[in-house]
Amino acid sequence: MIAYFDTSALVPLVVEEPGSRFCARLWDKAARVVSVRIAYAEGRAALAQAHRLGRLTSPALREAVSQLDAVYGQLDRIEVDDDLVRRAGLLAEEQALRGYDAVHLAAAERIQDRDAVLISGDAQLCRAARQMGFAVSQPQ
């Protein structure tokens, strides 16, 4: 299985959340794990916000960033280029997606493999992906 992880599925790999075990099982099961290059910046932003909100202590933030670095290093990364952002813009409009979610969906389209599964905790992104024919796994 090729697993495309959006940021909402990557963060539970490095911070204990309700979907952490689910995401870890899919990560371990995948023959190949893929995301878009900007997932790192988006993940760091999510970890920093968790720290600002008091959900992560400073040492826990440093550990989570270290783990995110390791996870990111194992990903096959899809590059953000002009074609991708233009496709994402169209998907944002057609599928009522936020910008980064549209970028994730446009990136997942580039995999072009029947065994690919999009993994996301975002209900709107999952809905749009299903409408477009993707196999989807959503952490509960």
Predicted regions and their residues:
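Short active-site oxyanion
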Residues: M1, A30-V33, Q74-D76, Q112-V117
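Short, well-structured N-terminal submotif of metal-dependent ribonuclease cores
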Residues: M1-A39, A50-E63
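Acidic, PIN/NYN-like endoribonuclease modules and their adjacent C-terminal/linker elements
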Residues: I2, L105-A106, R110-Q140
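Anionic, Ser/Thr-rich low-complexity intrinsically disordered regions
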Residues: R25, A64-V71, R77, L125-P139
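Acidic catalytic patch
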Residues: A39, S66-Q95, A102-A106
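Entry/capping segment at the start of metal-dependent catalytic domains
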Residues: G43
